[in-house]
Regions:
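Small-residue-rich segments of transmembrane alpha-helices in multi-pass membrane proteins
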Residues: 17-22, 50, 76-86, 149-161, ...
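The first (N-terminal) embedded transmembrane alpha-helix
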Residues: 9-29
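Flexible loop linkers connecting adjacent transmembrane helices
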Residues: 60-77, 102-105, 110
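Transmembrane alpha-helix boundary signature
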Residues: 54-65, 92-102, 165-166, 227
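Short, hydrophobic transmembrane alpha-helix segments
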Residues: 26-38
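Helix-loop-helix junctions within the multi-pass membrane cores of secondary transporters/permeases
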Residues: 80-158
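C-terminal transmembrane helix-loop-helix hairpin of multi-pass membrane proteins
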Residues: 2-12, 37, 162-229
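Loop-to-helix transition at the N-terminal end of transmembrane alpha-helices
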Residues: 35-53
Length: 229
């Protein structure tokens, strides 16, 4: 219960400034219909309660299981590291709320660029492949620079072959993957993998998976753009 109170307090003081700014705008400039304003206040309250419960659940279950899986997979063999690394990255991204909201907004824009499900699939595939790369990096002690620099070079090369719409969407796709589900789970997973190998620096080797998980969807959506073109 104390842990939940702490999460509630942190979320409350995070949401409060945004709520106060909206209230100030309502009083001074916007003057939205009163029913809409009440709906916003109710939504703010639900957000505080819901996010508090979510973060409580993440710290209670998601982080420990992520670290446990990360420390167990390297013992099961190379194939299982690749298979479950990809599978975990894929399904955790499919469940990511930010990704779904992003894909829905693209579809609602009405530009017929790609459907919501196609975008979610492409982004999830990109994260899945990135998680595999990150886990192999931790196992074989590969420098993060050797993976990130070629990845971003590939991003800009692909940028010449996609439309401006897909280029913008692809770059934003890398940001939406760093959501409240994906980030804590992947960080715990990465630290769990590194903990298996003695003498490894948990900072230099345990972190960086989120960076790789961000560039993977960018490349995946750009490849989708090349196929669509």
């Amino acid at each position: 219960l104390d842990q939940f109170k702490q999460e509630f307090r942190e979320v409350f003081f995070s949401i409060l400034p945004v709520t106060l700014v909206i209230v100030l705008l309502q009083v001074t400039l916007i003057h939205m219909p009163f029913s809409d304003f009440l709906q916003f206040l109710l939504a703010a309250l639900l957000t505080i309660v819901g996010l508090s419960l979510f973060l409580f659940g993440v710290k209670l279950g998601l982080l420990p299981i992520g670290e446990s899986l990360g420390s167990s997979l390297p013992h099961k063999g190379f194939f299982w590291v690749i298979f479950f690394g990809f599978l975990l990255g894929f399904v955790i991204t499919v469940a990511e709320p930010d990704v779904r909201i992003f894909a829905q907004q693209i579809e609602d824009a009405g530009e017929r660029i790609a459907t919501q499900n196609v975008l979610i699939l492409a982004i999830s595939l990109g994260v899945g492949i990135s998680v595999v790369m990150a886990m192999l990096r931790s196992i074989f002690n590969i420098s993060l620079t050797l993976l990130l620099i070629p990845s971003y070079i590939l991003v800009f090369v692909l940028g010449y072959f996609v439309s401006d719409d897909f280029f913008s969407i692809a770059l934003d796709a890398g940001g939406v993957t760093t959501g409240p589900i994906t980030v804590p789970f992947l960080m715990a997973l990465s630290i769990g993998v590194v903990s298996v190998f003695g003498g490894r620096d948990k900072v230099s080797q345990g972190f960086g998976m989120v960076a790789l998980a961000s560039v993977g969807p960018v490349i995946a959506v750009m490849v989708l753009g090349v196929l669509f073109s």
